[in-house]
Amino acid sequence: MSEQQRQGAERDLYRDTWVRYLGYANEVGEAFRSLVPAAVVWLSYGVSSSYVLADAIDKGKKAGEVPSPEAGRNTRMALAVVDTFVWQSLASVAIPGFTINRLCAASLYVLGTMTHWPPTVRKWTTTTLGLLAIPVIIHPIDRSVDFLLDSSLRKLYPSVEKPSTP
């Protein structure tokens, strides 16, 4: 859904408020991976995954509230849940988490081999790079996931009316 369409629509708790940032918790966890216990990183994935699940359930509930013939209601709800869950899982958790993880691992390795900085400085530099990369990767990943789903999963939907892009 474009920004202009969203402005005219009802405000979405999961997309238009601070709650959206919960979906990025795992990227922050990945950025801090070299400084915190692994349990903290896994907790950040739990927060992001909870956000994804809550958004998918919310979109399914909203799809069920749209007035239409009862026969298509369950299908519409299921499609909304599946589409939102898959989109959010890829765009908010899996792809950005992998990207930040690899960026931080590579930068920590490079800093370790090419500098004589103390380990603490290398780790904080890696964390800073990971945090700075988050806003840079979000929109390209979102658009790539839109393209991926439009080219695959969304072609399987039984009706012409597709769920709106998250």
UniProtKB/Swiss-Prot annotation:
InterPro entries: Mitochondrial_18_kDa_protein. The chain crosses the membrane at residues 34-54, 78-98, 129-149. It is a multi-pass membrane protein. It comes from the Eukaryota. GO terms for cellular component: mitochondrial inner membrane; mitochondrion. GO terms for biological process: apoptotic process; mitochondrial fission; mitochondrial membrane organization; mitochondrion organization. The modification N6-succinyllysine is found at K123. It is found in: Mitochondrion inner membrane. Belongs to the MTFP1 family. Involved in the mitochondrial division probably by regulating membrane fission. Loss-of-function leads to apoptosis. This is Mitochondrial fission process protein 1. It comes from Mus musculus.
